Amino acid sequence: MTTSAAATLQTARDIVRREGQGVADVADQLDESFVAAVELVGRVTGKVFVTGSGTSGAVARRMAHLLSVCGTPAVFLPGMDALHGTMGAVVSGDLLITISRGGESDELNDLSRRVQQRGVPVIALTASPTSTLGTLADLTAVVDAGPEVDPGGVIAMGSTLATAAWGDALAAVLMQIRGYGWEQVLFTHPAGAVGRIEQLPDALPSLAADGAERRPEA
């Protein structure tokens, strides 16, 4: 390799800046669909399942984890595993969040249709609202960081960070709506440095929303 250190660092910094801008742009894309998603997830009496394939699957796993940490019980559901029987775990009272940038992943669209047949609503997170997923979902939220945040507009890098940020906002807002406190967070997160925190952080501002389920104290 003969690339200079300066060129290497400049390229790396340009990538990070583009990705950072893509994430920042998500703030302006939050609209009525986000509010509707908060209300829909807040009314769920069962569990929230989150699915995706490839890099979207990695984001889905992270989103499910953070929803659970923040007081909204959620489970990552691998798309192909679901079509080999795991879908049986999804029942009436649950909800499915399907993540697909292009909205044309056959296994995710098949899964989404099948859970709808069981009376389970589907929220789609996609950059393409006119895609198959975008049109079949009960609620579609558009998360579009633009093609420039992904190399060649193909390799999902910045776009996955943008979708992750949308999920972070969902988890944090629901936490504040439910009044889910730090005591509850630490009860379910006893391991690692978080579990050894001696002084609780300041309480988050409370939000009010019609229909949101308040989860029981730990």
Predicted segments, located by residue:
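Internal, active-site/partner-interface "lid" segment
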Residues: 135, 149, 175-215
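An N-terminal, well-structured beta->alpha segment
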Residues: 1-43
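Flexible interhelical turns and helix-capping residues at alpha-helix boundaries
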Residues: 27-30, 101, 178
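Glycine-rich phosphate-binding loops that contact phosphosugars or nucleotide phosphates
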Residues: 42, 46-176
